[in-house]
Amino acid sequence: MELIKKIQDRDAAEKAYYDVIEPYSELLEFSFHKEFVSEEKVTQRTASSDSLNTIASENNDENVINLEEFRQLKRNCDLYQRNLQKLQLLFKQQSQKNTLLEKQLSLQTELNQEKDKRVKILQDELWALQLEVAALERKSPNA
C-alpha cells in the first residue's frame, strides 16, 4: 500500500512539473516569435535607408520603445530558458527516482509472492502434521 501511495505521489509530481513546464514552453515560443517579428521590422527599416532619413521623431521614440520591449522580452526569454532547464533537470531526477521505485516495487512484489508460496507450503505441512496427530490420537486410546 505504501508503494502504491508513493507511485501516486510520483504521478502527481510529474503532472505538476508538466503543468509548470508547458506554459514556459509556450511563452518561450511566443517570445521567439515576437523576437523574430521585431527583427524583421528592424531589417525592413534598415533596408529602406531612404525612408529612415524621413522618419519623424515620433517614429524614433516608437523604435526606442520597441527596442526596450525587445530587450525585456529577451530577458524574460533567458529567464524562462533557465527555469525550463532547471525544471527539466528536476524532471529527469524525479524520473530516475521513479524508475528506482518501480524496480523496488517489482522486487518487493516478487519477494511477497515467494513469501506467499512459502506460507502456503508451511500451512500445508501444518495441516498434514495436524492430521497425523489426530490419527495417532485415535489409535492410542484404542490400543
UniProtKB/Swiss-Prot annotation:
It is a peripheral membrane protein. Disruption phenotype: Impairs atg8-processing. GO terms for biological process: macroautophagy; meiotic cell cycle; protein transport. Its main location: cytoplasm. Keywords: Autophagy, Cell cycle, Coiled coil, Cytoplasm, Meiosis, Membrane, Protein transport, Transport. It comes from the Eukaryota. It is found in: Cytoplasm; Preautophagosomal structure membrane. The keyword Cell membrane does not apply. The keyword Ribonucleoprotein does not apply. GO terms for cellular component: cytoplasm; cytosol; phagophore assembly site; phagophore assembly site membrane. Residues 66-142 form a coiled coil. Stabilizes the atg5-atg12 conjugate and mediates the formation of the 350 kDa complex, which is necessary for autophagy. The atg5-atg12/atg16 complex is required for efficient promotion of atg8-conjugation to phosphatidylethanolamine and atg8 localization to the preautophagosomal structure (PAS). Involved in endoplasmic reticulum-specific autophagic process and is essential for the survival of cells subjected to severe ER stress. Required for meiotic chromosome segregation. Belongs to the ATG16 family. Homodimer. Interacts with atg5. This is Autophagy protein 16. The gene is atg16.
